[in-house]
Amino acid sequence: MIVDTSAVVALVQGERPHATLVAAALAGAHSPVMSAPTVAECLIVLTARHGPVARTIFERLRSEIGLSVSSFTAEHAAATQRAFLRYGKGRHRAALNFGDCMTYATAQLGHQPLLAVGNDFPQTDLEFRGVVGYWPGVA
């Protein structure tokens, strides 16, 4: 399962009902993964809300949920551009931003479900059940 920044923020901030749904999805996940650029985005968002302790908060959560970090390759970059062309802000109602496009690309290339909170990813071709989006034809 690929984890988006929005899911981590919902969990850390205790956003109801999303935090509960994210925690349940993570409890059922084998090995949740976040791409390296998404980790950077997540740290920036958490730092804006929590200051310098954001790194500690993130690393503690990462350890608790067994979150691994994946590399981001040229193939990911090309898939990110394709995601932007199809679903990017100003091009589609999903209005995916740069970080969203990277997360979408990571999930797409890995054929992995996507854990996210918000109204953007459900506007893509992912089929959402709660906070987890699945690729069409894959449950």
From Swiss-Prot:
Keyword Metal-binding among UniProt keywords: yes
Cofactor(s) for this UniProt protein: Mg(2+)
Record domain PINc: where: 1-127
Top-rank taxon: Bacteria
Residues bound to Mg(2+): D4, D100
EC number: 3.1.-.-
Xref: Gene3D superfamilies: 5'-nuclease
Molecular functions (GO terms): magnesium ion binding; RNA nuclease activity
Keywords on record: Hydrolase, Magnesium, Metal-binding, Nuclease, Toxin-antitoxin system
CDD domains per the UniProt record, alphabetical: PIN_MtVapC28-VapC30-like
Membership in a protein family: Belongs to the PINc/VapC protein family.
Purpose of the protein: Toxic component of a type II toxin-antitoxin (TA) system. An RNase.
Name assigned to this protein: VapC ribonuclease Mb2004c
Organism classification: Bacteria, Bacillati, Actinomycetota, Actinomycetes, Mycobacteriales
